[in-house]
């Protein structure tokens, strides 16, 4: 069994690759930014270049790997993700892939827009196993710009969530769940909403950062339109995807999550990481 890991340098895919490597599980990384310096077997894969989709299946022989039987499915950051992802799923199935682990989002139900439609398509395929991972907000988003720069230089976190609370999750915990879903075979057509162990507003996140960094961090609350513009102007996110991301933030404000589940511990045997633990470990990146 060889596992294809798409989104090779992404937050969860890079961590999943490290777990698979440590476990000596055969895998191949598919990424648009492959490098000869990569420590892992890799193949050029670009969602926007259909001619690259066959590369991982054609190149496994040169890496001394068995045929690909499972795929970690991370889509492109665009609202037009559904047609290419479904086409790739069909290609992968024709090559003998038996299982997919799809990365979706906690507030995108099966059959909804974007990843929700891919989720529904996987569910409709006979003889195909899948697990849809639906994580909440990543703690690691605070380590990336513009949030990292805002924390470091402007002493603030920025969101459109108001005082809505989020069960922030670490990418390490998501990768651990994905690892178990990919390597522990069984009859699966299921989903996991992946949450952290506590509900926090961005205001509470700011308070935790204040206590760790030794300087006052505040929460700047934006409107949906203001946050959309920031995602486009400061991150370079496509406008339609930025609008979807901002709308998801506003959903937190209007319909806050008030319950927690134990999915991480259920799947991995270990509880998820608390935000304070994460922030203490990463604090030098905000100094």
UniProtKB/Swiss-Prot annotation:
The keyword NAD applies. Keywords: Alkaloid metabolism, NAD, Oxidoreductase. Its EC number is 1.5.1.44. One of its GO terms (biological process) is indole alkaloid biosynthetic process. It catalyses: festuclavine + NAD(+) = 6,8-dimethyl-6,7-didehydroergoline + NADH + H(+). Belongs to the fgaFS/easG family. NCBIfam families: ergot_EASG. This is Festuclavine synthase I. The lineage of its organism: Eukaryota, Fungi, Dikarya, Ascomycota, Pezizomycotina. The gene is ifgF1.
